[in-house]
Amino acid sequence: MRNALLNKCVGRLFFAALFLVLSLSKTVKAQESFFSFDNRTYFEIDGRYGKYFPFEERHAYMKVLPQYGVDLRIGRQTDGRMQWEKDFNYLSYGAFLRFEKNNVDSIQFKDRDENGYERETWRALGDCYSLGGYINGHFYHGKYWSFDYDIMGGFSFWTKHGDEFIGSVANVHLAIDAGPTFMIEDNFDLLVRYQFSHSSNAAFRLPNCGINVFSWLVGVRYHPKGRPELVPKEKPRPEFQKSTSIFATESVGVLQTNEWMRSYQTADGTMVSDLPVERPYYFANVIQLGVHRQFHPKFSYDVCLDFGWTGETKRMYEKAHQMYDDGHEYFTGDDAIPLMEYSFARGLHLAPSVMFEINYNRFAFCLGGAYYLWHGIYYGTDQKKTWSLKESGESNFEDTYLPPCYRTFYGRLGFKYYLGENRNMFVGSFMKVHSAVIDYAEFTFGINLFNWKDKK
């Protein structure tokens, strides 16, 4: 019995030792592969000094407060061995790590207590650590200097959160900048940038004003093995064949109702608290059917119809019944609106939309917009849709039954990544916004149903 147990333990130790040796050997090989970079790899360190740019007037006191930061980057310089690298004037790409020191001892934070009454507190704004990826492109690329732009995207983590600006510990971090880069010698660059950066949680958790900063950035870029030799551009450039696709997408997201929607005032001015059953998060879904046109190696656009649905509409109808029971002015008098019952169809929306894409090989930055033509809340009523660009105020019916994120128009900002040998599928993530406010984040899967190329 003792020998059997001893043999069993020895066997386990043998396999554990074998596993450890194999793991160490693979780790050493991986490190050798990682650190054996070529002349396309570079390292960069940047220092930042900026000022806050608050959107809300009540946060104007923050404009004079400074923010300091440090960036570390590792990048890859393209050399034109692929056509898209030449099309984008030999851009570079890589990963960044960022630290931001926020010198704000106290920030104003307004919310509501359990009875629906507004309250004001002051809290400290914590520091921020961010990591993600970036693209560094050139508006002008010369022999000794270039005028560049950077697009950065990733995640940020805040040491303090739960206030009006940063509602959660994990957030999205975005930045865009422009400025000159000077090639000092074969191994060093000096760069200067003017940058706008934004950090928020894409409305996953409210409140979510976010932090906006305009800053100056000065950095040094180090090329350990010099610069790569660039493959010359072909003149004339290779002929491009335009193409068209019919596509369909499925986009899902969750949103949290804005804080001001969680209470309302009755006709006599009394603040009424929310419904007893709290439903803070709502599912949102958009199905798109449209046409994708690739009219240039770097640019394309979509024209489509958005068929949307949100569970937040049900909440609006429940709130309407509470308002009716409390004798709200919308339900009294000659201009009284009807008291309606909720159904699945009343949560539907229809909107035509367009989107413009900048295509970096398989990766695309996207910017688009849409306008609502129809809402399900009108189904079975004699109420008419308002066509102005105002979000509310012209229709008591819309103010009562239509969720605030679905009033008139909306925009999309995000990215796609094309999959497959023929790039017939894609995944993406977008911020659905209106009036410079993020409604919620969408996660998208799409497929091209039909494709054809223009005749030569």
Give short role names for the model-derived ranges:
Residues K51-D71, Q108-T121, Q256-Q288:
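Surface-exposed strand-loop-strand hairpins of Gram-negative outer-membrane beta-barrel proteins
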Residues G47-F53, R76, L97-N103, G153-H161, ...:
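Transmembrane beta-strands of outer-membrane beta-barrel pores
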Residues I45, V70-R76, L131-F139, I151-F155, ...:
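Residues on the lipid-exposed face of transmembrane beta-strands in outer-membrane beta-barrel proteins
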Residues Q31-R40, D79-L91, Y140-F147, I184-F188, ...:
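Short loop/turn motifs that connect adjacent beta-strands in outer-membrane beta-barrel proteins
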Residues L72, N212-K233, I438-K456:
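Outer-membrane beta-barrel "beta-signal"
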Residues F55-A60, S106-R112, K160-E164, A202-C209, ...:
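Outer-membrane beta-barrel translocator domains and adjoining extracellular loop/strand segments
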Residues T41-I45, L91-A95, F147-I151, L174, ...:
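Transmembrane beta-strands of outer-membrane beta-barrel proteins
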Residues N39-T41, V64-V70, N89, L125-L131, ...:
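Residues that define the transmembrane beta-barrel architecture of outer-membrane proteins
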